[in-house]
Curated annotation (Swiss-Prot):
The gene is CRK13. This is Cysteine-rich receptor-like protein kinase 13. Residues 283-292 have a biased composition (Basic and acidic residues). It is a single-pass membrane protein. Residues 1-24 form the signal peptide. The lineage of its organism: Eukaryota, Viridiplantae, Streptophyta, Embryophyta, Tracheophyta. The modification Phosphothreonine is found at residue 523. The active site is at residue 483. Belongs to the protein kinase superfamily. Ser/Thr protein kinase family. CRK subfamily. The modification Phosphotyrosine is found at residues 431, 531. Residues 264-292 are annotated as: Disordered.
Length: 673
């Protein structure tokens, strides 16, 4: 049975190699280059991370920018019309990820993602909105099927040329506003035989003129004909236009379209074209190709190499699994009981951890779920070991939750999980060791808080936002932290923040905006009002917690130290803001060693985060833009919740917060450019 399965896989690979590979990203080489991990790179990553949400929520098209002067990055996202928000967001997210991965230092790049839907992502260091200078960038990735039309070629070309001609005319006509993906878009098909259609899709960016769109598409069709006119499908891509045709539907683009009437042809009804596995010989267009039966083409060589590599990988995987089965897994029953067998490769033997921590002798701190100890593995790596003290079912769930979630997360502002261990009721989580411990350990200690000057605090504010932005927009799946606080921000040797403690975190579906729980988990003072009162949590409840955290970082005091019968922490800050004295909040240990405009801007952002209504709060992509672009004008904040004893329950008066990501921030998002 296993041999048959392996044979099926290999056969599939060999068959698939008969189709040319799709590589639709273009890192433009004739422009400037940036320094990886520099300011331009950070701005590039930031604006690309915000594209999925901005594009999906804006009629399938978004253009904006972030940064200043030479570090300014312009970006565009576009989906085909009638894409679902989920399909559009996923497509843009995938395309942006490929650009970040493959275009390591190019300041200009674009990517057409082809399936399961079609979308475009482009970024540049110069503004390109409405620019049709496509001829300076040669068409990239003329991708085609290696099969060809072997009979009825004349009749086929007549139908094909008519289809592409009318599709160009329809696509280039302006039908809606320049900010809608429905502008300059058309799909159509034509009957080839009774049982076979030809399908075509054409799209231009909606911000160019009809003539520019027409010229770009016409040029693409002519280039395809001169290159690959006998093939059974293909595409031509430029930064501003896209053309594809196939003998099958694609990109979820052909639902509910009306077939335009095909002009009558003088020849008799067509027979179904014969698709040959090899290109036809003796055609002037194909003279550049090497059709000699005595020579092996480069495409064939590449296919053989790829197949060989894949076979080696499969064989290596099979051998590795066989060897792994020979070693009996330890604590198999207990591991299965935790429900985390999918990450079993991260499991340490309990004895290893016991030895590494010298029998748990050097305690670093204590949290709500247990003690944290310092250790050293046999290879010399320093580790932090969380030893869960509670034995309840809830603690088991949080243990499983944290291990499974954190094991999949990779970001410089998220703590890195190294492994775990289970022995009976003992449950251990192993993290990277961070020498400066947690933020609260330094921030709220009068003898240590002087180590955090304003520059370090500002770095912690920005780094924490980047970490949560990753959880909300860039991780798969979306994660709501639910317990963001100073004690859950760890600091490395350079005071870079790393978000930690995912025991109470929850996963959100792609289209999910809010969830309700009967057991609100979190820390009083950081919890949003809708979460405390109604059990509603969302991305915006994390935003609220972040706002409180930012204010704590500025003042150097716990939020609980400001509570009184008439006000709480956020209302105290609000009164300072309204009285025009926000700098009275600043920690005295910072003295005058700070930029007042930066501090005031951070207080302003924090007050936007702690507004009472979830829909009034910015999402983290906007927060990052506020922190990195001083030219962005901030909205006037609304009053925060007071939580004063005796206050009427808000649940009877608060409007529904089901639509967490409504349009209140759309104007601000449009200001990126």
């Amino acid at each position: 049975m296993k041999q048959r399965s392996l044979l099926s896989i290999l056969c599939f690979i060999l068959l698939a190699s008969g189709v040319a590979s799709v590589s639709a990203q273009t890192c433009i080489e004739n422009r400037k280059y940036f320094t990886p991990n520099g300011t331009y790179d950070s701005n590039r990553r930031l604006i690309l991370s915000s594209l999925p949400n901005n594009t999906a929520s804006r009629d399938g098209f978004y253009y904006g920018s972030i940064g200043e002067e030479q570090d300014r990055v312009y970006a565009l996202g576009m989906c085909i019309p009638k894409s679902t928000p989920s399909d559009c967001s996923n497509c843009i997210k995938g395309a942006a990820g490929w650009l970040i991965q493959d275009c390591v230092n190019q300041t200009d790049a674009y990517y057409w993602a082809l399936d399961p839907t079609l979308c475009l992502v482009r970024y540049s260091n110069i503004s390109f909105s409405g620019s049709a200078a496509f001829w300076e960038i040669e068409p990239q990735y003329l991708v085609l099927n290696t099969a060809t039309i072997a009979s009825n070629l004349t009749e086929f070309k007549t139908i094909w040329e008519d289809l592409t001609s009318r599709t160009i005319t329809a696509a280039s006509a302006a039908r809606s506003t320049p900010s809608s993906s429905d502008n300059h878009y058309r799909v159509d098909f034509a009957n080839l035989t009774k049982f076979q259609n030809i399908y075509a899709l054409m799209q231009c960016t909606p911000d160019i003129s009809s003539d520019e769109c027409n010229n770009c598409l016409q040029r693409g069709v002519l280039e395809y004909q001169s290159c690959c006119g006998n093939n059974t499908g293909g595409y031509v891509m430029r930064p501003i236009c896209f053309f594809r045709w196939q003998l099958f539907t694609f990109s979820k683009a052909f639902h509910n379209i009306t077939l335009a009437t095909t002009p009558p042809l003088s020849p008799p009804p067509l027979q179904r074209p014969v698709v040959a596995s090899q290109p036809p010989s003796a055609d002037n267009r194909d003279k550049k190709r090497d059709n000699s039966s005595g020579k092996i083409s480069m495409k064939t060589i590449l296919a053989i190499v790829v197949v060989g590599i894949v076979i080696l990988i499969i064989i290596s995987g099979i051998l590795a699994r066989r060897f792994a089965r020979k070693e009996k897994p330890y604590q198999e029953v207990e591991l299965n009981q935790t429900g985390i067998t999918s990450v079993r490769s991260l499991q340490y033997k309990f004895k290893t951890i016991e030895t590494a921590t010298n029998n748990f002798s050097e305690r670093l701190g204590h949290g709500g779920s247990g003690h944290v100890f310092k250790g050293r593995l046999p290879d010399g790596k320093e580790i932090a070991v969380k030893r869960l003290s509670e034995k309840t079912e809830q603690s088991k769930k949080e243990f499983k939750n944290e291990v499974v979630l954190v094991a999949k997360l990779q970001h410089r502002n998220l703590v890195r999980l190294l492994g775990f261990s289970v022995k009976g009721e003992e449950k251990i989580i192993v993290y990277e060791y961070l020498p400066n411990r947690s933020l609260d350990y330094i921030l709220f200690d009068p003898t240590k808080q002087g180590e955090l000057d304003w520059k370090k605090r500002y770095k912690i504010i920005g780094g924490t936002a980047r970490g949560i932005l990753y959880l909300h927009q860039d991780s798969q799946p979306t994660i709501i932290h639910r317990d963001l606080k100073a004690g859950n921000i760890l600091l490395d040797a350079h005071m870079n923040p790393k978000v930690a403690d995912f025991g109470t975190a929850r996963i959100f579906g792609m289209d999910q905006s809010v969830a309700i729980t009967a057991n609100a988990a979190g820390t009083p003072g950081y919890m949003a009002p809708e979460y405390m009162e109604l059990g509603e949590f969302s991305m915006k409840s994390d935003v609220y917690s972040y706002g409180v955290l930012v204010l704590e970082i500025i003042c150097g005091k716990r939020n609980t130290s400001f509570s009184s019968p008439v006000q709480n922490f956020v209302t105290y800050v609000w009164r300072l803001w309204k009285s025009g004295t926000p700098l009275n909040l600043v920690d005295a240990t910072i003295a005058e060693n700070y930029k007042s405009e930066e501090v005031i801007r951070c207080i302003h952002i924090a007050l936007l985060c702690v507004q009472e209504e979830p829909t009034d709060r910015p999402d983290f992509s906007i927060i990052m833009s506020m922190l990195t672009s001083n030219s962005l004008i901030l909205p006037v904040p609304k009053p925060p919740p007071s939580f004063i004893p005796g206050r009427p329950n808000q649940s009877t008066t608060r409007p529904s917060s089901q639509n967490i990501n409504d349009g209140r921030w759309s104007l601000l998002k449009m200001m990126f450019h």
